[in-house]
Amino acid sequence: MAHQTGIHATPELKEFFAKARNGSVRLIKVIIEEEQLVLGSHKELKHAWDQDYDAFVLQLLDESQPCYILYRLDSQNAQGYEWIFLSWSPDHSPVRLKMLYAATRATVKKEFGGGHIKDEIFGTLKEDVALSGYKKHVSSCAAPAPLTAAERELQAIKINEVKTEISVESKQQTLQGLSFPLRPQAEEAILLLKQKKINYIQLRLDLEKETVDLVHTKHTEIQDLPGRIPQDTARYHFFLYKHSHEGDHLESVVFIYSMPGYKCSIKERMLYSSCKNRLLDSVEQDFLMEIAKKIEIEDGAELTDEFLYDEVHPKQHAFKQAFAKPKGPAGKRGQKRLIKGPGENGEDS
C-alpha cells in the first residue's frame, strides 16, 4: 500500500532524522498527514534510556490515532546509536488508518535507516509498548523456540553443510535466529485476518530478496483448502476455522506449514523451516493474534473438516484396560477336579 499511495517522509522529517540519529534526541514521533510522513513531536535526552522510557513514550500515545515512535537506546552499533521502532495501532482507531499505518511501516524504517533499529514492537494497548512490554518482547525473542524432529534434522543439515549456496551473512547460523521481514501487503493481510475481515492468507518466501511475501487472500471454505496447497513448493497458510464445539460457535486461527516432501530443494526446505518460528513469534507477539493450532503437512488432501477439528480439539484418550476374565471367588480355590471313571462316584456300573 505504501508504494501505491506514494507516502514518503517530508524533506523536513528527513533532515530531522539525519540530525537525530546521533544527536541528543531521545524520542521521535512520526505521523501521517496529507499522505506524507511528518514529525509529530520529539523529546530530548534527560536520563538513562530506561528511566526516560515510560515517561516519554506513554504520554504520546493517542487511544484513537496510530503513530510510529523511534526511541533511542544508550547502546551503539557500527552505524551509531541503536533505536527501538514502535508501531502504535490502538483498537479504537479507524480500520482505514490501521491499514495505512501497517502498510507504511516499512517506509518509515527505510527513511530512518534500518541499520539503526535494534528492536521492533507492535502494540494495540499501552502495556504492549510500555517498558515492561518491551522487556518481555526482548526476553521472548532471546529464548529459542522448541524444534520439531524435522527441524532438528534440518538444523543438523545446515550446520554440517555450511558451504551451501545459502547466503545468511547478516543472520545467525541457527534455525532459531533466521528471520525474513514481512512485506507491507503481508502485514496488512495479517491485520485483516485478526479483525476477521478475511479468512485465509497464503505467504511465500522470496529466497532472493529474503522477505515474506503475500501470495493471496482468496476467500476459502474448508472444502477449498486442499486446493490451496501447492504440490511443488512450500507455503505458509493462516486459516480462520469456523466450527462448533460443545455447543459453542468458534472461530479459530490455524497455521498450516505445507512442505511437499523432497520435491523442494534443500535450500527451500531449510529456509522455510527456519523462518517458520520467527514468523509465528511476530504474528503472536507483534500482531497479538492468537493461533489455536500449528500444523505441518505434506499434502493438501490431509486438510479435511474432521482432521482440523481433531487438531484444534484433540480427543482425550482415556486409558482402556484390556478385557480380563472375571475373577473367581475370593479366598483359596479348592482342589482341582478330577474326571472319574465309571463307579468311582459310588454308582453302580
UniProtKB/Swiss-Prot annotation:
<dbReference type="InterPro" id="IPR029006">
    <property type="entry name" value="ADF-H/Gelsolin-like_dom_sf"/>
</dbReference>
<dbReference type="GO" id="GO:0048471">
    <property type="term" value="C:perinuclear region of cytoplasm"/>
</dbReference>
<dbReference type="InterPro" id="IPR028458">
    <property type="entry name" value="Twinfilin"/>
</dbReference>
<dbReference type="GO" id="GO:0030042">
    <property type="term" value="P:actin filament depolymerization"/>
</dbReference>
<dbReference type="InterPro" id="IPR002108">
    <property type="entry name" value="ADF-H"/>
</dbReference>
<keyword id="KW-0963">Cytoplasm</keyword>
<keyword id="KW-0677">Repeat</keyword>
<protein>
    <recommendedName>
        <fullName>Twinfilin-2-B</fullName>
    </recommendedName>
</protein>
<comment type="subunit">
    <text>Interacts with G-actin; ADP-actin form and capping protein (CP).</text>
</comment>
<feature type="domain" description="ADF-H 1">
    <location>
        <begin position="4"/>
        <end position="139"/>
    </location>
</feature>
<dbReference type="Pfam" id="PF00241">
    <property type="entry name" value="Cofilin_ADF"/>
</dbReference>
<feature type="region of interest" description="Disordered">
    <location>
        <begin position="321"/>
        <end position="349"/>
    </location>
</feature>
<comment type="similarity">
    <text>Belongs to the actin-binding proteins ADF family. Twinfilin subfamily.</text>
</comment>
<dbReference type="GO" id="GO:0030016">
    <property type="term" value="C:myofibril"/>
</dbReference>
<dbReference type="GO" id="GO:0010976">
    <property type="term" value="P:positive regulation of neuron projection development"/>
</dbReference>
<dbReference type="GO" id="GO:0051016">
    <property type="term" value="P:barbed-end actin filament capping"/>
</dbReference>
<keyword id="KW-0206">Cytoskeleton</keyword>
<dbReference type="GO" id="GO:0005737">
    <property type="term" value="C:cytoplasm"/>
</dbReference>
<dbReference type="GO" id="GO:0010591">
    <property type="term" value="P:regulation of lamellipodium assembly"/>
</dbReference>
<dbReference type="GO" id="GO:0003785">
    <property type="term" value="F:actin monomer binding"/>
</dbReference>
<feature type="domain" description="ADF-H 2">
    <location>
        <begin position="177"/>
        <end position="313"/>
    </location>
</feature>
<comment type="function">
    <text>Actin-binding protein involved in motile and morphological processes. Inhibits actin polymerization, likely by sequestering G-actin.</text>
</comment>
<keyword id="KW-0009">Actin-binding</keyword>
<dbReference type="GO" id="GO:0051015">
    <property type="term" value="F:actin filament binding"/>
</dbReference>
<dbReference type="GO" id="GO:0005884">
    <property type="term" value="C:actin filament"/>
</dbReference>
